[in-house]
C-alpha cells in the first residue's frame, strides 16, 4: 500500500498551525517541493529550507502566524485534500472552482506541472485537483 505524500504534508502543516508551532518538517519529494514553492509564492508560509539528515532530505517550513494577542487565535491555513488515491477528481480549466471568490487557491496537477488555479486558467489547461487552501 502506497503512501499519500500530499495528504501527509497537508496534515503536517495543518496540525502544526493548529498547535501554533512555528516550524514544521516534512519529507522532500518533487511533488512536495512544488507544492511548498506555491505556498511560499502565495504567502501562506514565510520560509523554506532544505535539510539533509542520514542521506534523507527534508523541507523545513516556517509558518506564518498572527501576532495579535488580544483576539483569540485563528488558524491562518485551512487546507483540504480533494483528489486522493482512491478517488481522483479532474477538472477542465473552465470548471476549476474558485475558493472564497478568488481569495483562496486551488492547487492542480497538470500536464505542465503543479500550478495554481489562476495559472491554469491563464494557460487554458485543466488537471487533477490536489487541494484547496484558504
Curated annotation (Swiss-Prot):
The keyword RNA-binding applies. Keywords: Chloroplast, Plastid, Ribonucleoprotein, Ribosomal protein, RNA-binding, rRNA-binding. Part of the 30S ribosomal subunit. Gene3D superfamilies: 3.30.1370.30, 3.30.1490.10. GO terms for cellular component: chloroplast; ribonucleoprotein complex; ribosome. InterPro entries: Ribosomal_uS8, Ribosomal_uS8_CS, Ribosomal_uS8_sf. Its main location: plastid. This is Small ribosomal subunit protein uS8c. GO terms for molecular function: rRNA binding; structural constituent of ribosome. It comes from Atropa belladonna. It is found in: Plastid, Chloroplast. It comes from the Eukaryota. One of the primary rRNA binding proteins, it binds directly to 16S rRNA central domain where it helps coordinate assembly of the platform of the 30S subunit. Belongs to the universal ribosomal protein uS8 family. One of its GO terms (biological process) is translation.
